[in-house]
Regions:
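An N-terminal domain-start capping segment
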Residues: 1-5, 74-81, 91-97, 175-181
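Mixed-charge interfacial surface used for oligomerization/domain docking
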Residues: 2, 14-34, 86, 99-114, ...
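N-terminal glycine-rich anion-binding loop in soluble enzyme alpha/beta folds
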Residues: 7-70
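Short catalytic-loop micro-motif centered on adjacent basic/acidic residues
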Residues: 8-9, 62, 89, 115, ...
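A general structural signal for short secondary-structure boundary/capping elements
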Residues: 53-59, 78, 134-138
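Glycine-rich phosphate- or other oxyanion-binding loops that anchor nucleotides, phosphorylated ligands
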Residues: 57-94, 101-102, 148, 155-158
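Short beta-strand->loop
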Residues: 91-93, 116-119
Length: 269
């Protein structure tokens, strides 16, 4: 996409792949992951490496948002390469990270930068960013204000939920108690985590195998949230079986859902 007209910006936590970012002219600002005594850019190493570190050391990797310096580096490069071109920054939920605040600090004095909180993470954010990228590709005359208005409409409509494969990382990070963790393990309980007004909230509990609860969510979530059937974005993490993914697709197609897009979660979520 031609970035001489309008530039889209998002964090690596959107889980937009480098290939999709390049194809759609999206600038990705790295978030960060700390483990093993060092801090690395999210997306600069394979996700399984982080899981293996935790299994070996039982030390939870820490994630952190983009710093003002991260954004300053990007803004300065864009100033050199595309002077004066408007920048629309579609931010990872500001309830969960400091990234948006960092961007606002770095953008001080730059009148060409407009920031919007997507109130979403991972695939929810990706859906908004990539949909706006498609709008700009199909309608290159779109102004910054028009793109921002379109993004606001998407932000209001996005509904997102996911089911963790297990609660080890949530327990290690202090997000669930030991009692709740043990109860979930014994009873085979899997919480549904929804993104509500930018926050990660447990809204429902499923019981059974991962395959069973994923299929139950697939049956219930689209109808409960009145999701539009012409485009669904599906989130998966390392370890989700191909058989489950194919069954999910088949079931959603039976419901009349089209244009299914899978997004693999990275380290941050």
């Amino acid at each position: 996409m031609n970035m001489n007209h309008l530039i889209l910006l998002a964090e690596s936590g959107s889980d937009i792949t480098p290939e999709l970012a390049e194809e759609n002219g999206i600038i990705i600002v790295p978030m960060h992951v700390s483990f093993g005594g060092e801090t690395r850019d999210d997306g600069s190493f394979p996700v399984p490496e982080m899981f293996e570190f935790y299994k070996k050391h039982r030390e939870l990797p820490r994630t952190s948002g983009c710093t003002p310096h991260d954004f300053e580096v990007v803004f300065e490069r864009l100033d050199r390469e595309y002077p004066g071109v408007p920048i629309l920054y579609l931010a990872y939920s500001s309830c969960t990270t400091c990234s948006m605040q960092s961007a606002l600090i770095a953008a001080q004095g730059r009148e060409n930068v407009l920031a919007l909180d997507t109130k979403s993470v991972t695939a929810g954010q990706a859906a908004i960013v990539l949909t706006i990228a498609r709008l700009l590709r199909e309608h290159p005359e779109t102004t910054l204000e028009q793109a921002a208005d379109a993004a606001k409409g998407l932000i209001a409509r996005v509904r997102m939920g996911f089911i963790p494969g297990d609660l080890d990382y949530l327990r290690a990070g202090g997000r669930v108690s030991n009692g709740a963790y043990l109860g979930a393990k014994i009873l085979g309980i899997h919480p549904l985590i929804e993104i509500l007004d930018g926050k990660l909230i447990s809204t429902k509990k499923y019981r059974g195998t991962m395959k069973r609860v994923v299929m139950q969510m697939t049956r219930e979530f689209p109808a409960a949230q009145n999701l539009e059937k012409d485009a669904l974005w599906l989130i998966y993490g390392a370890g989700l079986g191909e058989d489950i993914m194919r069954e999910v697709e088949a079931h959603l197609h039976e419901q009349g859902c089209q244009n299914l897009t899978w997004v693999q979660t990275g380290c941050v979520i």
